[in-house]
Amino acid sequence: MAVFKTLTDADMAIFSTGLVAGVDEVGRGPLVGDVVTAAVILDPNRPIAGLNDSKKLTEKRREALFDEICEKALSFHVGRASPAEIDELNILHATMLAMQRAVAGLSLTPELVLVDGNRSPAFNHAGQALTSHSIVKGDGLIASISAASIIAKVTRDREMDALDAAYPQYGFAKHKGYPTKAHFDAIAEHGVFDQYRKSFKPVKALLER
């Protein structure tokens, strides 16, 4: 498969038999909240049917798979970067930091890390440098990355639901913090609070009025 062109023979051997962590993120585009990432090491002896890119799954299916991943995975961990860190570092570097935190938090040391997308940060676990590769559209190709995308997506969606309960006037349960017309209208009427990413242009423009 073309997806494996970047993997060496040694990496392929690890992919087939070793501890492989899949990593993905959610929440780079929203105006509010953390960017959330997850790292997952699946158990090859306990396969999970139906794993796919979280965006291609219904909410009900994501929730069911979330529970199954939590039960069956050898290890998983959620990493995040806060709005303040996003504002300080920029969204790309904050996302890389969140991914590093997700991998560092695993209870097992992976032999290989596969990251969705076209770039990967340097990973360390318990003081050990790890081999990693980025896989374009990996969340639809690699089971462990699919699992990570589901863990990250469900985690962040639940956080947006909690934010919606605290600030119902913003409609977070519907738009999940993304820059929709309804969200812009709510910001124009009610302003922003500390969970907003103040470096993002729409928020910055409002604050500079």
UniProtKB/Swiss-Prot annotation:
One of its GO terms (biological process) is mismatch repair. One of its GO terms (molecular function) is RNA-DNA hybrid ribonuclease activity. It is found in: Cytoplasm. Manganese or magnesium. Binds 1 divalent metal ion per monomer in the absence of substrate. May bind a second metal ion after substrate binding. CDD domains: RNase_HII_bacteria_HII_like. It comes from the Bacteria. Its cofactor is Mn(2+); Mg(2+). Its EC number is 3.1.26.4. GO terms for cellular component: cytoplasm; ribonuclease H2 complex. It catalyses: Endonucleolytic cleavage to 5'-phosphomonoester. A divalent metal cation binds at residues 24-25, 116. Keywords: Cytoplasm, Endonuclease, Hydrolase, Manganese, Metal-binding, Nuclease. Residues 18-209 form the RNase H type-2 domain. PANTHER family: RIBONUCLEASE H2 SUBUNIT A (PTHR10954), RIBONUCLEASE HII (PTHR10954:SF18). Endonuclease that specifically degrades the RNA of RNA-DNA hybrids. HAMAP family: RNase_HII_B. Belongs to the RNase HII family. This is Ribonuclease HII.
